[in-house]
């Protein structure tokens, strides 16, 4: 668990700014705690994916994609911290691909979950407005392509920088600066986009009815979304601020790497105190927001959703959605009376699915038959 001695003849990079200052039992205890937390999250997500099969939900949906990304993220973080039980030196001398996989790729997975949250809440808005704005359907494909391109850009930048930073002739400071600038700018932009979606949802009572029919609520969505936005934005802003500081300034942070909240790739090795701070920051800025996302997309029993206490007794989710008196609480919902035959999409009964295309006319017809 001790940091190896510095040998200036073997490495031209800057020497560590820290000396071992944390007792070995403290580091061992923290490593155990970190690993247990990640393993617990891994086990919980694994159970959720099995429940998808048990309750016969759709196997390819927003829910399953989110859960799979979180499962992969938790497994990579657990493997990384397991190195620090006996292989502390190996954890700081990884090859280019292994370094990218354990240190960089989990950050990419978190960005992917943020983009998927944007797409999911944008879909909720589309569902609520597609009745009187059917032309919105033509913007769905460009929106998906835009977020796909952004995600690929994020992935390529991280992979390229991770490979370059491991080369002997690389300008590590420049490479890390470019990566941090691009990554955190994209994080901030996606966070702003998500905040706009949440604001629109909070102003549309019909979107709230849809979320309630899925076992959630506008209040729950807003709380989780705002928390994730604040955590990711604060992390990105911190990284950008540190990026703007001079060498003398960020050395005074007493961290043995440059981008303390992201990856340990500017200086040669993590120091003892730096390792402690690294784990704590990952817990606050990674484990906590990821756990919130997992909680929101957890698997619910379809039978329990049908008897949700928020539903009007005697109505199923579909009739509750169309008959709910709160749908006229806002100007957006009043517009649903304008063109009752123009709806091109509707809220399907499948949980967190990619989309159903049942017509509004068929649903209103069935409701009229039920009323007669």
Swiss-Prot record:
Superkingdom assignment: Eukaryota
This protein's GO CC annotations: lysosomal membrane
Bilayer topology annotation: Multi-pass membrane protein
Annotated glycosylation sites: 11, 259
InterPro entries per the UniProt record, alphabetical: GPR137
Residue intervals annotated with topology Cytoplasmic: 54-64, 115-144, 195-222, 298-372
Lumenal side: 1-32, 86-93, 166-173, 244-276
Subcellular location: Lysosome membrane
Keywords associated with the record: Autophagy, Glycoprotein, Lysosome, Membrane, Transmembrane, Transmembrane helix
Biological process according to GO: autophagy; negative regulation of bone resorption; negative regulation of osteoclast differentiation; positive regulation of protein localization to lysosome; positive regulation of TORC1 signaling; regulation of autophagy
Regions that span the bilayer: 33-53, 65-85, 94-114, 145-165, 174-194, 223-243, 277-297
Function noted in UniProt: Lysosomal integral membrane protein that regulates the localization and activity of mTORC1, a signaling complex promoting cell growth in response to growth factors, energy levels, and amino acids. Interacts with Rag GTPases and increases the lysosomial localization and activity of Rag GTPases and thereby regulates mTORC1 translocation and activity in lysosome. Involved in the regulation of lysosomal morphology and autophagy. Also acts as a negative regulator of osteoclast activity. Also acts as a negative regulator of osteoclast activity.
Family assignment from sequence similarity: Belongs to the GPR137 family.
PANTHER family named in the record: INTEGRAL MEMBRANE PROTEIN GPR137 (PTHR15146), INTEGRAL MEMBRANE PROTEIN GPR137B (PTHR15146:SF0)
Name of the protein described by the UniProt record: Integral membrane protein GPR137B
Lineage: Eukaryota, Metazoa, Chordata, Craniata, Vertebrata
């Amino acid at each position: 668990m001790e940091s190896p001695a510095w040998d200036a003849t073997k490495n031209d990079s800057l020497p560590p700014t820290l000396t071992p200052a944390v007792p070995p039992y403290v580091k061992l205890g923290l490593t155990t705690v970190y690993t247990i937390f990640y393993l617990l999250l891994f086990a919980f997500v694994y159970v959720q994916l099995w429940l998808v099969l048990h309750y016969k939900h759709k196997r390819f949906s927003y829910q399953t994609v989110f859960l799979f990304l979180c499962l992969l993220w938790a497994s990579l973080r657990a493997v990384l911290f397991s190195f620090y039980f006996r292989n502390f030196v190996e954890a700081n001398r990884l090859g280019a691909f292994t370094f990218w996989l354990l240190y960089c790729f989990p950050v990419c997975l978190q960005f992917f979950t943020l983009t998927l949250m944007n797409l999911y809440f944008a879909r909720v808005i589309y569902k609520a407005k597609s009745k009187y704005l059917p032309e919105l359907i033509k913007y769905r494909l460009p929106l998906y392509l835009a977020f796909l391109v952004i995600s690929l850009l994020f992935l390529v930048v991280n992979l390229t920088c991770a490979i370059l930073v491991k080369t002997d002739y690389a300008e590590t400071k420049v490479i890390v600066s470019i990566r941090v600038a691009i990554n955190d700018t994209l994080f901030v932009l996606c966070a702003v986009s998500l905040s706009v979606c949440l604001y629109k949802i909070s102003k549309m009572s019909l979107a709230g009815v849809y979320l309630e029919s899925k076992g959630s609520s506008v209040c729950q969505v807003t709380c989780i979304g705002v928390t994730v936005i604040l955590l990711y934005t604060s992390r990105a802003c911190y990284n950008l601020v540190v990026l703007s500081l001079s060498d003398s300034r960020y050395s005074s942070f007493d961290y043995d790497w440059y981008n303390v909240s992201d990856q340990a790739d500017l200086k040669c090795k993590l120091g003892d105190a730096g390792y402690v701070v690294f784990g704590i920051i990952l817990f606050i800025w990674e484990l906590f927001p990821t756990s919130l996302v997992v909680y929101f997309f957890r698997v619910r029993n379809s039978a329990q959703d049908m008897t949700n206490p928020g539903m009007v007794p005697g109505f199923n989710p579909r009739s509750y959605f169309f008959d709910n008196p709160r749908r006229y609480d806002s100007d957006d919902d009043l517009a649903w009376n304008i063109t009752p035959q123009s709806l091109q999409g509707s809220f399907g009964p499948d949980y967190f699915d990619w989309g159903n295309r049942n017509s509004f006319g068929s649903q209103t017809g069935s409701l009229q038959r039920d009323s007669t």
